[in-house]
């Protein structure tokens, strides 16, 4: 399946669930304690990361989605640290503070990239606390497209059936990362995402692929779910729906360092993709790719849109050069700048590529290490040049440009001027051919404001696409 990313910035998601703080103490071990046969860790790094439902919300925000987060916290310093952690990425916390309970904290001691011990600081919340949280969250349903219930069995989500029913009645999809042996608590959910252990805790041991599908379809019918996505570690994922064939998605993980938070990443990528307009199979493929990225990181982590673009490109065997999308180019440009490469950018219609174009692009490339050529799509060429243009469709124009040794990346744009795409990419040097004044070059002011430069190059005399077309017409 060829996967493209939807406009994540359009996604509006509410996450409700068990929020917690993941705290890491990190340091070297060089000796065994004289008091007991345990290593002594000299702590030289302390790090706090939002975990549980808060990690789901951060993953959504990192992908570019708009997200609100509802959860139960204590009246303590940990709650303050958690608030700061989620607000850093623009997540709106909607806490319900329970004064006599601590904010859940998971403290991990690490050395040499290995977890030595985990210490949990928590007390289960009361059922009444969950009722109040879900009631408070009802007011947020009108402002979102998807709800995620992130259940870690800590008490935030006790009996959510009425909340799910209300959300579905409002046309809001409800995704659940479940816990426990009673999936009936999530009756009517749009999608649940158990891992294999969680799935078998409910349905019993799975003996074969056919058995998995039969048991999944039984759960769909029993609890009125629209779909079940079973995450299966090295076997990837299996999506089962009521009205379509099952979908098996193989894993794309290259290296596995830590599975902490992988389930959070799956449901956050699903929620963001679905809220942005992706269909369910596409959203599952995106989530599978995101999970493959996050297990290659240590500790509770997030996955960015740029990382997803890179992972999808690698999965599809793409080199990262040639004809690319804007998102692919944004990632490639970021990497080029990290390598210290000077990036030059130009633009045009390039309807019939001629020797003047080739010479101009060679000059442009000589001014830096990499050259981007932004190409007007067919509709914008017609608006600029009139009926009968372009002679060559944009895919063909870009393919020819990508074949030139001087050109590294070719990207289409649909506006009459390249102002928007230049402003997004901000090359080190923007060049334009002809007799332009610097102040009249689209995107030039933005490039200069970002510390870049703008330069005008001359075209070789005697070459013109219009003249070539007229000459062809005259000789017919």
From Swiss-Prot:
Keywords: ATP-binding, Carbohydrate metabolism, Kinase, Multifunctional enzyme, Nucleotide-binding, Nucleotidyltransferase, Transferase
EC nos: 2.7.1.167, 2.7.7.70
MF terms (GO), sorted A to Z: ATP binding; heptose 7-phosphate kinase activity; heptose-1-phosphate adenylyltransferase activity; phosphotransferase activity, alcohol group as acceptor
Pfam families: CTP_transf_like, PfkB
Record-level GO cellular component terms: cytosol
Biological or metabolic pathway of the protein: Nucleotide-sugar biosynthesis; ADP-L-glycero-beta-D-manno-heptose biosynthesis; ADP-L-glycero-beta-D-manno-heptose from D-glycero-beta-D-manno-heptose 7-phosphate: step 1/4; Nucleotide-sugar biosynthesis; ADP-L-glycero-beta-D-manno-heptose biosynthesis; ADP-L-glycero-beta-D-manno-heptose from D-glycero-beta-D-manno-heptose 7-phosphate: step 3/4
Keyword Kinase recorded: yes
GO terms for biological process, alphabetical: ADP-L-glycero-beta-D-manno-heptose biosynthetic process
Residues holding ATP: 195-198
Region annotation (Ribokinase) ranges: 1-319
Catalytic activity: D-glycero-beta-D-manno-heptose 7-phosphate + ATP = D-glycero-beta-D-manno-heptose 1,7-bisphosphate + ADP + H(+); D-glycero-beta-D-manno-heptose 1-phosphate + ATP + H(+) = ADP-D-glycero-beta-D-manno-heptose + diphosphate
Keyword Metal-binding listed: no
Entries under SUPFAM superfamilies matching the protein: Nucleotidylyl transferase, Ribokinase-like
Active site: 264
Region annotated Cytidylyltransferase, chain positions: 345-476
Subunit structure: Homodimer.
Family the UniProt entry places it in: In the N-terminal section; belongs to the carbohydrate kinase PfkB family.
Function field: Catalyzes the ADP transfer from ATP to D-glycero-beta-D-manno-heptose 1-phosphate, yielding ADP-D-glycero-beta-D-manno-heptose.
Name used for this protein in its record: Bifunctional protein HldE
Lineage: Bacteria, Pseudomonadati, Pseudomonadota, Gammaproteobacteria, Alteromonadales
Gene that produces this protein: hldE
